């Protein structure tokens, strides 16, 4: 059997309530473009508002409707999406 790792945070269930792992708010500053095979993913630039990376601008891929000024809750702030490549 696989051992349960203690260093990975898990969700806590108390009755009908689920407490998720820490998330950091980030504001959408710019919409870069659409990606995915059918354009279902939007690449955006966000400014992280809290945490150790507060004030940092990073590129993220977002699925679903999004517009400038929206607040996204990011579970991690270290990984950045690759820039879109446009064909000429």
UniProtKB/Swiss-Prot annotation:
GO terms for biological process: maturation of SSU-rRNA; ribosomal small subunit assembly; translation. SUPFAM superfamilies: Nucleic acid-binding proteins. One of its GO terms (cellular component) is cytosolic small ribosomal subunit. InterPro entries: NA-bd_OB-fold (IPR012340), Ribosomal_eS28 (IPR000289). Pfam families: Ribosomal_S28e (PF01200). Keywords: Ribonucleoprotein, Ribosomal protein. One of its GO terms (molecular function) is structural constituent of ribosome. Belongs to the eukaryotic ribosomal protein eS28 family. HAMAP family: Ribosomal_eS28 (MF_00292). This is Small ribosomal subunit protein eS28. It comes from Nanoarchaeum equitans (strain Kin4-M). The gene is rps28e.
């Amino acid at each position: 059997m696989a051992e349960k790792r203690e260093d990975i945070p898990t969700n806590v269930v108390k009755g009908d309530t689920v407490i998720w792992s820490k998330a950091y708010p980030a504001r959408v500053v710019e919409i870069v473009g659409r990606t995915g095979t059918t354009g279902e993913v939007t690449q955006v630039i966000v400014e992280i508002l809290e945490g150790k990376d507060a004030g940092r601008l990073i590129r993220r891929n977002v699925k679903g409707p999004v517009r400038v000024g929206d607040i996204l809750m990011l579970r991690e702030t270290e990984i950045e999406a690759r820039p879109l490549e446009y064909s000429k």
